[in-house]
Amino acid sequence: MRLGVAATPDVAIPTLDWLLGTDHEIALVITQPDKPSGRGRVLKQTTVAEWAEIHKIPVIKPQSPTELIGHLEDVDCVITIGYGVLLPQVILDIPRYGFLNLHFSLLPAYRGAAPAQRALLNGETVTGVTVFQLEKGMDTGPIYSQLSIKVEPHWRSVELLSELAHQGPNAVATALSMIEGNIKPTAQSGEPTLAPKITKEEARLNFSNSSESIVNAVRAFTYEPGAWCLWNDQPFKITSASVDGNQTLASGEVIVSEKRVFVGCGRDSAIELLTVVPAGKKEMPAIDWARGARLLGGENFG
């Protein structure tokens, strides 16, 4: 088939790479416009745009969905992967087989912008990917294919997203084969749940919560927007942590014991800090930060 791909983030790359090796043709890539980046606010294009340029595939960066009119009429199907733009039905109806979306959850669970992060936040042990027919409702369309994976307990969002991204080609392959075989997708069934975008304020850690919920928050929010708290009134990010069952500390209390750093949580529980990002610094082992901070005892995270 002659395909378009509408995508923005790095997680689209495994599927794009796979498509290059198939009999399908990537006729064009659609991605978001270049945006200012870094301290110099220099315009930077998306990872997907860079990929398309390397492989000499036409790229369009519409400011508005209506700019897609005139580009999709000779395309059989468009696959979207984290494109980040809601498309009206008039656009979805242009390609012969419409738009497919690769979504990082087992729909109808976790409809929305942050399915992988929400799954980690809720302590899910199984999640997966879904390829479905895109329609104007948010992640409500009928399903072509689903693949489930086990969520390893040490995975953070970066590791989970990487694994889900590498499951994408298999799910997309099944969906495209079904379309070519004139097999119709199946309506979603079950109780839907939502996965709205993570806000910075939501990512602030509350040490009165249980150690399990705080570790899940660290897993979910690393690295974007980052699980954070305050240390000496400055933002302080925790990028990896584990539950510890041997310490009894006040909520937010920080101690160093046997070259390990512990923080008290709610319900008489505690976590061990593994890696952190102090204000103005790069990521480092928690014990290195603690040595530099010269903890005296009685200090607390805010």
PLM features: what roles do these ranges have?
Residues 1-225, 269, 278-280, 299-302:
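One-carbon transfer enzymes
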Residues 207-302:
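An anion-binding loop in the catalytic cleft
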